[in-house]
Structures are given as C-alpha cells and as structure tokens.
C-alpha cells in the first residue's frame, strides 16, 4: 500500500510501511513465525540505531503463532533499552498476548474493543512418532507453558 507525499518536486508515492517506520511505528500483524520475528527485530534495530532515546510504538494485531518465534520477539523487547509503547489493535491472542504483556507497566495500551487471549501451548500440525518422541514433545510443551506462565505472573 502506498500514500502520496507532496514536495517541491511534485507528488511521489511512498510505501505506507516506510512512512510509518519513519514515524517510529512497527506493526506486528499476522501469524507470528520466524520471518515475522526477524523482520520485527530488523526494524527495531534500525529504529534503536537511529535514536536510542526516542520512543518506539509497537502496534499488535495477531492471532499468535510459533512459540520460539514469539519468544524471540519477547527477548528483543526485554533487552531493548529504548522506551517502547505497545498497543493492541483488534486482537492479541496466544503468543501475541505474551508479547503485548512484555511491555512495561503504563506503556501498554488496549483499544476499547480489542481482545487478549492466552491458552496452553498447542501441538503443531502433523505430529507423529513413537511414544518416546511424543513424550519428549509433551515435556517440551509443558516447559513452554511453565515459562510463559512465569513471564505472565
């Protein structure tokens, strides 16, 4: 999506995402996966590099996604010294809710009709294997659940 920008040289089309990023706004939307996590971290690093003291707004509208990718975003937010403001626009479910909750108290904003939802970690599609491998997956899910619960306390 593009927007028009007027200048002395006429009208140019500017990608909307670039314009929002120049206003220090990062959108976290759609399924949380490895690609989205790395894109988020690249954008965060660019904005921190430009001005480490100017606040960054993170706008979330996501049904969640992969645990590992969500934890990567969580870790990036926790390690960031730049002031962050997190906004829930519409929904923050599952890992997106954890990411929203990772913001500092007083710096998290929930729009009036937005929703948060947290649930126990779920198995991914196509899980198969012998009893030992299924037990290992189950133990991994329980560990993830405990880690998430500890973060949310």
Language model regions located:
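Terminal-region recognition feature
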Residues: 1-153
